[in-house]
């Protein structure tokens, strides 16, 4: 079993959630606030349930292994939560310009070279701080350098906290295909601290809101109803509560299907179409955020699910959900990404959907919602049906 070689400092009221997958142990650390009320959701590995301050662990103790930091370059100028400032002062840091462009072999090679230059060994620890693209890249590098370094993920975006950092997936893009090269490797720890959300611009909250909505749509009808009464930029949102709910949905699913052979596939809801949009955007050099693309993908997939539904009430419920997503995307973002996305020709998206890594043979497989909170995976989507529901959606 791989473990981070950093001493644990026991403190009160600082629970962690253990995740145990394929002989690799990960801990989900919950800093102070409402998240400190997390119940211990897993009873495996009880001897590893420590209570401690993740920041103090690094700054107040003698570290047995070297630790190196990969961080989103935005934090060279943005304020960093005070608890983490000493970590930066004591560490060698490699700054990464976040965004889909960073998920490339070239950027991975640059970090491998940096790790070689600083003499990192396989017993050292890589601490990866940033949003989804930064943690995707950093985790891929960590999982491959010298056959695997210990690594800690500290997601700083809502998207990272509820989705990207959880589940052991990492990857880079290749030949225009999203996440074409990557591994399933669990981090040693995941530290979720919603104080990072104070650093986010409006559009980044919307990105994470789309992934949070996805979790609710495929797995929690009550959470979906709660989200329907909110907007991502409400000033009084209880982020601790929502992050807990969203991350718990994903955690429960991946416990039973870590390598995505079955139920975990439902977490790809909206992603087949969303990834195709991102690929077209990359080719045309059009800025398009992942969460926004997934939101558009979910709108279309909900229309498809409504088209296939036998029950009239389910049809109505699914179309209402599609309209709710549309409302958020239109109201919470500027018009450019919406106008660009909805003006795309579905026949130009189809070749990228055919190359999606989730497909088998020549079929495009998508996720169909039977109702809110209930999803089926590996559902064949025909090109004519896709073009029809794309038109109906917009």
Specify the residue positions occupied by each region the protein language model found.
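Active-site segments that bind and position negatively charged phosphate/pyrophosphate groups
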Residues: 226-347
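Short, positively charged low-complexity motifs
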Residues: 1-9, 13-14, 23-40
